[in-house]
């Protein structure tokens, strides 16, 4: 039986080859005789909230409605549910509710964080697994590596999720001061998660608290280690 490590490496090689050989992304969007989508520039499919949207944008907005999001269980929906139901916060979808001051002070921050040295951590795990491979019993060696890989993935997901929750908890504990400083209304949480997928994190927040939010997130993350290395992000 072949090594699962070799099989995974081969899959990633084929994936990279496919990405490198992808077709041109250029395409004709309009013939100049139709109404265009305000978001994508593609031909409009339907009027939605007084603006024209392509079918792509229309479907996305429909699925962004709360009642449909609730059907999809994921990290973001779990966090929003906990902080909404248990602590009464509202996670807005409107940037205007995050940008509480107008004019020169109307700034919003888009924060994107990515785990540091993840490739090195995975390579270290692979190297250690290689040393312990039993060529006479590859099935067992493969099962051990699969379990190790799952543990690695689960830990990354857990630690990054917990770091985000820790950040929100600090905002919660200081909400009166934060709310007064940012002029928040209706118990708005000044942070809106966009992506929480393993070590890929993206959220939108009021620009005044962006650096502090990042600092809180990274400090929480630094408390944990994977493959004998401290977790970090930038």
Specify the residue positions occupied by each region the protein language model found:
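Regulatory and interdomain segments flanking nucleotide-handling catalytic cores
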Residues: 1-234
């Amino acid at each position: 039986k072949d090594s699962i490590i070799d099989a995974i490496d081969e899959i990633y090689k084929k994936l990279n080859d496919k990405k490198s050989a992808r077709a041109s992304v250029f395409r004709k969007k309009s013939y100049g005789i139709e109404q265009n989508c305000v978001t994508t520039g593609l031909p409009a499919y339907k009027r939605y909230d007084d603006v024209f949207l392509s079918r792509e944008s229309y479907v996305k907005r429909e699925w962004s409605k709360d009642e449909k999001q609730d059907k999809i269980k994921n990290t973001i929906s779990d966090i929003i549910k906990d902080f909404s139901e248990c602590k009464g916060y509202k996670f807005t979808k409107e940037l205007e509710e995050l940008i509480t001051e107008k004019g020169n002070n109307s700034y919003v921050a888009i924060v994107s964080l990515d785990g540091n040295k993840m490739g090195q951590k995975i390579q270290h795990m692979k190297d250690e697994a290689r040393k312990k491979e039993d060529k006479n019993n590859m099935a067992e060696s493969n099962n051990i590596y699969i379990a190790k890989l799952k543990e690695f993935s689960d830990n990354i997901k857990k630690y990054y999720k917990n770091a985000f929750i820790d950040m929100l908890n600090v905002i919660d504990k200081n909400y009166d001061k934060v709310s007064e400083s940012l002029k928040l209304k209706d118990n708005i949480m000044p942070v809106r998660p966009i992506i929480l997928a393993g070590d890929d994190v993206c959220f939108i927040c009021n620009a005044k608290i962006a650096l502090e939010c990042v600092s809180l997130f990274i400090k929480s993350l630094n408390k944990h280690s994977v493959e004998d290395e401290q977790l970090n992000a930038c």
